[in-house]
Amino acid sequence: MEQRKQCFNCHNQGLPIMALTTARSRGFEIDGDHLQAQLQFTADFLGRNKEKYREGNGQGGQVDTAGYALWTLDNGGWKPDGTTAAVAEYFLLRQKDSEHYRPESRRPPSEQSHFTSSYVALRGLKVFGLPEQKERIDARVEQVRQWLLKTKPEDTEDRVFRLRALQLVE
């Protein structure tokens, strides 16, 4: 893990923060300073790529990494800012000619499902999209919704994230 300390999700921050914030919401005591440091690390990770996001480019892991990062920030109570707005713009530009979001590689169990990629991107748009992006967000959500309704899941991950995504778009 020490060798990967600059990497975001699977090496250090995303899923552990989800576990910490879930534990806190259920009454467990957690180290709040540590949680804030991890949230700041995540925000800084995204911030280093802000200009790339505005141009429709991202970082390694593309939609999955950016989507999990925004999900992480939301779980920690992070408020929308210039960086999260840039990531929302990225979701509007990236794969815009596709009817859904696709992972950039096949690395199960964390990066394989088109349903997961679509969910994390839609979630990021819904939580961190700006009012001036609303029309484009609504159009993209409808585009992905149509894909979700007609596409059959192949495995458990697909089923789970298809259901989660359908909740977002209905």
Where do the model's predicted regions map?
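Preference for long, amphipathic alpha-helical scaffolds in soluble/luminal domains
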Residues: 1-170
